[in-house]
Amino acid sequence: MLENKMELKFLAKSENESFARVTVASFASELDPTLEEIDDVKMAVSEAVTNAIIHGYENKGGVVTICAVIEDRELTIEVMDEGIGIENIEKAMEPLYTSRPDLERSGMGFTVMESFMDNIKVESEKGKGTKIIMKKKFALIED
């Protein structure tokens, strides 16, 4: 049963990354998360949005869309861009790999997302964009 859903669209500008992170964290707050859980979500969203801006659009602008759904204490977050896409998803997800060494990127974005979320899936088509789907189950805290 679908409990709640939100969609957010914003320009692919680095100054919007913190707005996106806080918006998704606020949406997830209805699950009464621990501080650790909310920090995990913020970090993962931050990395996904930054990837869309820097790698998807190569800092040239575009629109990033975030859809978030809460169902059975699980938060599903989709971060989508219509940028250049990822040629080799498996390679892109390797720790320390970056398509932009000129920007001194660490290549840890997907690794960070994987460490903070329960599940991550990447769908991409060269020239059409990328969708990152992340899931996190929230513990039920009893008083």
From Swiss-Prot:
Entry's EC annotation: 2.7.11.1
InterPro entries, per database record: Anti-sigma-factor_SerPK, Anti-sigma_F, HATPase_C_sf
Entries under Pfam families matching the protein: HATPase_c_2
Alphabetized Gene3D superfamilies for the sequence: Histidine kinase-like ATPase, C-terminal domain (3.30.565.10)
Keyword terms: ATP-binding, Kinase, Nucleotide-binding, Serine/threonine-protein kinase, Sporulation, Transferase
Keyword Kinase assigned: yes
MF annotations from Gene Ontology: ATP binding; protein serine kinase activity; protein serine/threonine kinase activity; sigma factor antagonist activity
Catalytic activity: L-seryl-[protein] + ATP = O-phospho-L-seryl-[protein] + ADP + H(+); L-threonyl-[protein] + ATP = O-phospho-L-threonyl-[protein] + ADP + H(+)
Claim: Manganese is one of the keywords in the record: no
GO biological process: asexual sporulation; negative regulation of sporulation resulting in formation of a cellular spore; sporulation resulting in formation of a cellular spore
Function statement: Binds to sigma F and blocks its ability to form an RNA polymerase holoenzyme (E-sigma F). Phosphorylates SpoIIAA on a serine residue. This phosphorylation may enable SpoIIAA to act as an anti-anti-sigma factor that counteracts SpoIIAB and thus releases sigma F from inhibition.
Family: Belongs to the anti-sigma-factor family.
Name by which UniProt lists this protein: Anti-sigma F factor
Source organism of the structure: Clostridium acetobutylicum (strain ATCC 824 / DSM 792 / JCM 1419 / IAM 19013 / LMG 5710 / NBRC 13948 / NRRL B-527 / VKM B-1787 / 2291 / W)
